[in-house]
Amino acid sequence: VIRTPSNEESETTPSSKCQFDLANVLKKEMEELGICDVTLTDTCFLYGKIPATPGYENAPAIGFIAHMDTVSDYCDHDIKPTITENYDGEALALGQSELVLSPEMFPHLKTLKGRTLITSDGTTILGADDKAGIAEILTMVERMNKENISHGPLCIAFTPDEEPVP
């Protein structure tokens, strides 16, 4: 687990140097996946391109972007995810905390009945914003490579600090 909390007090980009730790790991993974022109800037912006497959060179480029930081307001270490299999559609207690996710407050939960849910235990953040986005983007690239999926030009970027530094 690579911790990447942003620092609201910082006046630099990135607001926390630990975001470079994740960026360096992602850079290597992007290169291993065959992403071209992978670049990590001195302000921790990471980006690369995937050329179009034959016959799709004139298709419009599509960009995928996610940020590497997590919020700093909550505990972001010793994360204890809770996995609820076959969710019953009722209120969902977050671990031993007093926090509850209720379908009344979050109506979308009703559509997830029978699914597997991953939440925090209520004492820490889960860190899925936006590391889940990063995982989805890289998994998409891996799958496109493995399954030889045709596509137009693709651009991928991972940024530091979702919220701008003042």
Placement of each model-derived feature along the sequence:
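Active-site metal-coordination/substrate-binding segment of hydrolases
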Residues: 56-151, 158
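Short beta->alpha junction loops
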Residues: 15, 160-161
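Self-splicing inteins and homing endonuclease
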Residues: 46-54, 114, 153-155, 162
